[in-house]
Amino acid sequence: MTSSVRIVGDPSRFAEQLVSSIAEHVESRVREALEAARKIVERAYEESASKLESELRRALREAEEQVQAYTAKREVELRKRLAEIRAKAVEEIMSVALQRLREYVGLEAYKEFIKRLLDSALETASRRSRRVIVHPARPDQAIVAELAPRVAAEKGIEVEVGEAVEGAGGFTVRAVEAGLTLDYRLEVILAPALEEARARVLEVLNQ
């Protein structure tokens, strides 16, 4: 027995309604699919954007850390260089001051100062050795060569004037037999005053 569907009314209108219903259903499904696809795309975009932002922040942090490290390193290098420059400037200033000491006090007063140093040095050295050698600092070579024999004669001792040594002024005395060397160069005997002067110069340079 064959079943049949009876269509009531206009068959063509029924067909239109059926097609319209199917079309609406299909359109609805398409809209749902498109909406789902849009959400997937948006989520992917948001995740990508978030990841990109995270990467950018990380890169920025690394760059800032590198800049800070470089800046700190450069600052240390600059401070070290500045300290070296200041130290060099101090030594140059002190060297000039020592070299000009004769001008400050006058030649005769300076020679009297060297003579007193020779008197003390030769007195000490001659007690230790019969052979005493005086080595003048280069700037005072002529003064020491002139005064040493005179001071030695006054004390009744013999003295040799040896080769010049480096120094801002003054001399060294060697008691040969005792293996003893006495240092009477200006930078040694004036050390306390020079340290005070160095501190003052550094204070001025740091202002």
UniProtKB/Swiss-Prot annotation:
Q: How does it sit in the membrane?
A: Peripheral membrane protein
Family designation: Belongs to the V-ATPase E subunit family.
**What is the role of this chain?**
Component of the A-type ATP synthase that produces ATP from ADP in the presence of a proton gradient across the membrane.
Record's keyword terms, sorted: ATP synthesis, Cell membrane, Hydrogen ion transport, Ion transport, Membrane, Transport
Q: Name one Pfam family in it.
A: vATP-synt_E
One GO MF term: ATP binding
Q: What processes does the entry annotate via GO biological process terms? A: proton motive force-driven plasma membrane ATP synthesis
A Gene Ontology cellular-component term: proton-transporting two-sector ATPase complex, catalytic domain
Q: Where in the cell is it found?
A: Cell membrane
Family matches, as HAMAP family: ATP_synth_E_arch
Question: Its quaternary structure?
Answer: Has multiple subunits with at least A(3), B(3), C, D, E, F, H, I and proteolipid K(x).
Q: Which SUPFAM superfamilies match?
A: V-type ATPase subunit E-like
Record's keyword annotation contains Cell membrane: yes
Protein name per UniProt: A-type ATP synthase subunit E
